[in-house]
Amino acid sequence: MKLNINQVNWPEAFPEKPEVTVEVNNNQYWLFLTYHVKGDQVRAVTTEDQGPVWEDSCVEFFCQVPGEEYYCNFECNCIGAMVGSRRKGRAEDVKPFSPDEMGRIERQCSFPREAFEEKDGLFEWSVELRIPLDLIFRDQKPTFPQKLKVNFYKCADKTKKPHFLSWHPIPLPKPDFHCPQFFGEIELR
């Protein structure tokens, strides 16, 4: 399925709206996410996993297995540096994925894995993620079709034009992606 990440939840403060889509596919072992982004600037300062990738040109995927109290967050900048964890909330019971778990997430980016400061201009870039389903389904094996609560995001906190786009709306007064109560739903097949 192909989804548009086009919700500008805070238009007065953060009106920037790059064009962003994500293609979602899976098999019995992997979740495949392919993001395509077209926007006016790009930044990639963070090169290490578990660093502040959200400050860069970043795409994100948060998900929760229905009935579980934890959700997972997968955040990847445009050169493939990632943050990943299981958690109950923004700062509640956060369990970062280990280096071995992070290493199992396969990434392919249209930019090489080299840091660069913000560049202005029109840029098109992509990020492909292959996430092992056992990182998401820790306590149970998925049975297909399998429902999953999710949201997809595009952000760039430290750029000249910061933005915070989502697939599913977030009706809050200020940006916060760590809100599983506002996740939408997809079905893995």
Predicted segments with their positions:
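Structural preference for beta-rich elements and adjacent junctions enriched in aromatics
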Residues: 1-189
